[in-house]
Structures are given as C-alpha cells and as structure tokens.
Amino acid sequence: MNNPYIPFASRILDVKKHTQKEYTFRMEYHGEVKPGQFFEVSVPKFGEAPISVSGIGDGYVELTIRRVGRVTNEVFENYVGDSLLMRGPYGNGFDISIFDHGETLVVAGGTGVSPVRGVIEALAASPAAADTHVIVGFRSPADMLFRPDLEEWKDKLDLVLTVD
C-alpha cells in the first residue's frame, strides 16, 4: 500500500484545454480513488496545491486546474510526457451506492463543477440516474467546462444549465 503522505511522480498522459485558465490534466495513477477525493500536486521550489479529482479511469485520474497562482502557473508549464509530484488521494470521497434510493440533487458552478464531475458521472451510469437532478452554472459561455459531458448528462439526468 502506498503512503499518501509521500509524493510520487505521475506522468501527464493528456491535457485538455477548456478555457484560457482551466485545463484538465490526465495523470497516470494506478491506485484506488473515489469521486470527491483530492490530491496535493507539488512543483519543487514553488509549493503544492490541493486539486480535486474531476475524473477517474483505468490507470489515470483527471485533475481540472485553474491557473491562479505560483504553483498552478508552474503546473501549466508542463506537457504530455512530463511528470508532476502528487500526494494522496485525500478525503473520504463519496460512496455512490448510497444514492440508489431516493432523489439526489447536485448543485455546482464554475470550477466548482470539477470536484463533483466524478460524482455526476457515477450517478449518470447508475440506477439512480432517473432520480438525479443536476443544476450547473457558469459565468458566460466562454467559461463553460466539460461541454461534451454536459451534452451527455442532459440525456441521462435531469440537468438544468444556467449561464449568466
């Protein structure tokens, strides 16, 4: 078992640009992780930042990062094939099976959609999809994240999308 307090190198498998400031980094990761958990991403000599898991797949996690400070500026200077240091995952995450009975409401806006994206994905693929209501908002069309996911979610869930 890996020690979540010891940093490990994780290779960048893919980078997806959403806006000028928000990118999703697909990071190599072979451990267990649940929707709602986060990693500490560190850049030597610059520091570390807690980044929520925005997607989970076989052999990877996705971290959607907004470029807002020293650490995230340095993260954005890395490309596919480069490695970043990570610690974690931290937090309890969500046991999606508890949502199988009764209605569920998920509300998120802007970059706050990132931490619940994995939860929404899991709910959309579960028996709870018919009873799941999602309200997502963004400041403007240019600020919208996860456009393909939004299209998919509206076919599986009760999705309300607001753009100011």
Label the model's feature ranges.
Residues 1-82, 138-140, 164:
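Ferredoxin-reductase
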Residues 70-164:
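FNR/FR-type flavoprotein reductase catalytic core
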